[in-house]
């Protein structure tokens, strides 16, 4: 599933499911209580691969957004103006918008962070099916480095603080 605690509370989680189609359909009603999107992706295990794909995109994206704004700050750009501009072009994303408070106001909400575990699972799963995972491997290494230097990450937005401070 994707959407975190807020999505669960609001009933807007995205469920990425795998397994027998009949069993999936039998579970649909209870899943609809907490989900706005429920997708059957294939056989048993397919939901986990879908979740790992989501986490891969989020992990890499968070670092890219953080680096972009760290560079902009150091170059003296008005990051409010940059943010407003990026949300009107092809760089716009839900993730960029979700990071607004960290990027513009140095607010880093404490959230459950499973990033390193999830990134490791994505690398391992890719390798298990014969897929090279160079970007994900580097991303995992960066998160591990940030985690070690920061004395632990209390939330996924903490990587932004680290990038701003280095």
Where are these regions (language model features)?
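Rossmann-fold dinucleotide-binding core
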Residues: 1-59
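Helical "substrate-binding/catalytic lid" subdomain
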Residues: 46-163
